[in-house]
Swiss-Prot record:
Protein name per UniProt: RING finger protein 112
Matches recorded under Gene3D superfamilies: P-loop containing nucleotide triphosphate hydrolases, Zinc/RING finger domain, C3HC4 (zinc finger)
Sequence segments annotated as region (Interaction with ZBTB16): 132-628
Subunit structure: Self-associates. Interacts with SP1 in an oxidative stress-regulated manner. Interacts with SIGMAR1 in an oxidative stress-regulated manner. Interacts with ZBTB16 (via C2H2-type zinc finger domains 1 and 2).
Species: Bos taurus
GO molecular function: GTP binding; GTPase activity; ubiquitin protein ligase activity; zinc ion binding
Reactions mediated catalytically: S-ubiquitinyl-[E2 ubiquitin-conjugating enzyme]-L-cysteine + [acceptor protein]-L-lysine = [E2 ubiquitin-conjugating enzyme]-L-cysteine + N(6)-ubiquitinyl-[acceptor protein]-L-lysine
EC number: 2.3.2.27
Amino acid sequence: MPRSALSVISFCHRLGKQERKRSFMGNSSNSWSHTPFPKLELGLGSRPTAPREPPACSICLERPREPISLDCGHDFCPRCFSTHRVPGCGPPCCPECRKTCKRRKGLRGLGERMRLLPQRPLPAAALQETCAVRAEPLLLVRINASGGLILRMGAINRCLKHPLARDTPVCLLAVLGGPHSGKTFLLNHLLQGLPGLASGEGSWPRSAGSGQGFRWGANGLSRGIWMWSHPFLLGKEGRKVAVFLVDTGDVMSPELSRETRTRLCALTSMLSSYQILTASQELKDTDLEHLETFVHVAEVMGRHYGMVPIQHLDLLVRDSSHPSKAWQGHVGDVIQKSSGKYPKVQGLLQGRRARCYLLPAPGRRWASRGHGSSGDDDAGRLRAYVADVLSAAPQHAKSRCPGYWSEGRPAARGDRRLLTGQQLAQEVKNLSGWMGRTGPSCASPDEMAAQLHDLRTVEAAKKEFEEYVRQQDAATKRIFSALRVLPDTMRNLLSAQKDTLLARHGATLLCTGREQTLEALEAELQAEAKAFMDSYTVRFCGHLAAVGGAVGAGLMGLAGGVVGAGMAAAALAAEAGMVAAGAAVGATGAAVVGGGVGAGLAATVGCMEKEEDERVQEGDREPLLQEE
């Protein structure tokens, strides 16, 4: 086909795709040049770009899935390339420009090469800019109308499995307090100071409002535990910690039942590593009572999950009547008030894990910033406290400490293992699974401790029985080892081990429903023993059949050889061919009989003689084995 004709055809295809009702005429000068591939830029831009579409065919303008690309820059679909290609041409010839050029791989080969490129970690600033999408408070634990708790694992995974927190140690700043204690107002100021500190600027935002974060007032965030969906990376390079803000909601509300409040304290202790308790004017008896419950529950959870119960606690008191009062004196007053009545709080305040701050009341002075020197001074105090909290947050990442309670003393810093966001999400899931199985008797920290103790006891009994079954399975893998232990004997061994475990671990249970717990444990152990016995019985029968077949075939094969040799010696007068045939048939027949008897021995060991007689009678059909 002439070159001009091909150019006209390609030109018609192009214009016909855009305007099918327009008539035209062209020549070789009207051929379009294909746009070259854009340069591949690896990096993260400020705006997300749409995915690039595959190149269009130069003839039909379709976008094939696997285009044929040539070095000249033109692309074709397989159908057009095979139709308009010049026949008999060795190297590929472009149907568009008639140049002889090599063929390039399509987009599939390009994608494979891009996957083989070395992956470079993105800068923290760029990654944080990308991840800062739709940051909002998320409800993690909801309190329904009946007072029950609903754990939203989807929201927890969205926060803790964030790209910045999935494989990074996490610090959870949780603010506790009763109604109208300035809790939400403090969260907003913490939220304002975090972006500047995370970006390295360290500057306070110029806007002095409460921010667009946690809402303030009666219609704000309540009835559950909330968390800011976006973490902030703080700390030195190489030791970054993902910091989250947590609003505990109504965890200290007197309207909740004791059971709901105890469970909320357990979830709060799991979802916090730096607690701030806010109180108006002074710590009341109700605040100390709720704090005593929280510390007790945190110790119970720490003992069960191997975590440091209270890593750091701030007592933030709004004392508008005595703004210059020393915080040491206030802590002394609190310790004296809690003496004997709140031992957990007293022990916490006497240690190094708690400190006290006195700030002006939020309703009067913080809102008057810019209208006098006193307002500026009070706002400076708030900023100083917020900066102090955020600078100390990376040092209080959520920590796991296995030897904390076993040795009876705080472990060293090097003994702790910092939990990442993904690990903490798994621990929260385990806690929710236990709470879903427990009964209504969890109205106090002591009852929760008893239930967790029984849970550890049951798990220990299960693991011990599983280990015993594994040992028996490993000891009976070989044939002769398995034949020494009959299935009935193995069943008796498992039953005795189960009774021993139930008697030993059942005596250590603490909850009132001890019988129900033992019945459930016995059912699980019996199910595991039955599953093992089913597989062991099949294995034992297989080993017995193999040994019986081998022994029977060997013994009867030897007997058949002896009988054949004797008959050959008795038939010396016969012809040589008849003697050889007799010996061969005798040996073969006896071997067959032996194999049959061996199989019978494996199936029914007690009836070996009867099965042997039947097999021999079947073999008497052979002429040379007939009896006189």
